[in-house]
Structure formats: C-alpha cells, structure tokens
C-alpha cells in the first residue's frame, strides 16, 4: 500500500489532512490498521473537547488489540465521524477515507512540523526490522 503524499503523519501512525478551512482531518494509517487487524470498535473524542498535542483522545479496538489514537496537534475537536463508530470495519477497507475526527489547530504551523510521506515511510520501514 502506498503512503499518500498529500497527507502528513505522526510517529504513532495517525494521518493528518489539512483542509481549506484551516481544520485538520485525522485518521489512522493503512499500516496501523494492517497491524491491528479487523476493527470492531472505535471511540472518538467528544466535539468541543480541547486536546493537547500527543494527548490520548480516541480508541480503536480490533480482534487483536486495543490502541490509543493521539492528537497530532493541539486544538479543539470540531467533528467526529459517527460512521466509523457504527462501522469500524470501514477503516480496514480504506484507512485514508475513513477519518476519525477533525481538529481546529491552536497553532496551524504545528501541522507543517508533522512527518511527510517519505519520513513516515522510514518509520514504517524501521518498525519492520
């Protein structure tokens, strides 16, 4: 699976898409869902919640394990995707369209500091060894 070049990434396997309105959309990467296996439960943060960068804010559970999802940037949660909560398997089907939540960043420059696709590819490769 190729890593989309138009997204940003975190060391903890979240993807981040900058939106035209200044918000960011967050999901888990294909690599993360591949490691976790079949998703059975997703809990997103509440809309209106203020997050610190790196804060545990969502949970994804699969048949193999439960994993925390971390806020890639500080900011306020402005949307949560109820569709992935009711159909967690959609993350397995296409991790890059099945987003989890949206954040209005406290500092938009924080998004630029996240990993690009090439840097994230190196993270994935380093974990494979």
UniProtKB/Swiss-Prot annotation:
Keywords (A to Z) from UniProt: Lipoyl
N6-lipoyllysine PTM positions: 64
PROSITE patterns (UniProt xref): BIOTINYL_LIPOYL, LIPOYL
Pfam families listed in its UniProt record: GCV_H
Cofactor(s) needed: (R)-lipoate
Cofactor annotation comment: Binds 1 lipoyl cofactor covalently.
One cellular-component annotation, GO: glycine cleavage complex
Gene3D superfamilies referenced in this protein's UniProt entry, alphabetically: 2.40.50.100
Annotated Lipoyl-binding domain residues: 23-104
GO biological process: glycine decarboxylation via glycine cleavage system
Superkingdom field: Bacteria
UniProt cross-references to HAMAP family, sorted A to Z: GcvH (MF_00272)
Subunit and interaction comment: The glycine cleavage system is composed of four proteins: P, T, L and H.
Function: The glycine cleavage system catalyzes the degradation of glycine. The H protein shuttles the methylamine group of glycine from the P protein to the T protein.
Family per similarity comment: Belongs to the GcvH family.
PANTHER family per UniProt: GLYCINE CLEAVAGE SYSTEM H PROTEIN, GLYCINE CLEAVAGE SYSTEM H PROTEIN-RELATED
Name of the protein: Glycine cleavage system H protein
GN (gene name): gcvH
């Amino acid at each position: 699976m190729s890593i989309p070049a138009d997204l940003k990434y975190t060391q903890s396997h979240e993807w981040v898409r900058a939106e035209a309105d200044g918000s960011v959309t967050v999901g888990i990467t294909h690599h993360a869902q591949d490691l976790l296996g079949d998703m059975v439960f997703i809990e997103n943060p509440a809309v209106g919640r203020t997050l610190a960068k790196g804060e545990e804010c969502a949970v994804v559970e699969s048949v193999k394990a439960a994993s925390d999802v971390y806020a890639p940037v500080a900011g306020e949660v402005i949307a949560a995707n109820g569709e992935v909560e009711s159909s967690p398997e959609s993350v397995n089907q296409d991790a890059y369209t099945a987003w989890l939540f949206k954040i209005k960043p406290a500092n938009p420059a924080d998004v630029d500091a996240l990993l690009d696709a090439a840097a994230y590819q190196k993270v994935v490769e380093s974990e494979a060894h």
